[in-house]
């Protein structure tokens, strides 16, 4: 069995509102792509608190208004 290593790179896939995000999504926060680990909103659904983890494993929270757009990233095979 041959083991192959593929080169993966991050690509901008979409711009989503906070209510469209899911756990494990990769989003842009302060010029850094991070992984979503939790999502919560206020009772009115107008403010979303997104907990995330950066590439060093450090966790933080960012807030978005319900009508803001968040850049969603995905890994793609750069060899194709």
Language-model features, listed with the residues they occupy:
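Serine/proline-rich low-complexity intrinsically disordered segments, especially terminal tails, linkers
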Residues: 17, 43, 48-51, 73, ...
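Intrinsically disordered, low-complexity, charged/polar segments
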Residues: 2-3, 59-80
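Mixed-charge, Lys/Arg-rich low-complexity intrinsically disordered regions
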Residues: 2-22
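Basic/aromatic-rich interaction segments and small domains that mediate binding to polyanionic partners
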Residues: 35-63
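Short, charged beta-turn/beta-strand-edge "cap" motif at the junction between a beta-strand
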Residues: 16, 32-35
């Amino acid at each position: 069995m041959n083991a192959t290593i593929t080169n993966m790179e991050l690509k901008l896939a979409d711009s989503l509102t906070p209510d469209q995000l899911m756990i494990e999504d990769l989003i842009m926060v302060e010029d850094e792509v991070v992984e979503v680990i939790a999502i919560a909103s206020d009772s009115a659904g107008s403010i979303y608190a997104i907990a995330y983890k950066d590439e060093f494993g450090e966790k933080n929270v960012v807030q978005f208004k319900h009508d803001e757009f968040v850049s969603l990233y995905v890994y793609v095979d750069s060899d194709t």
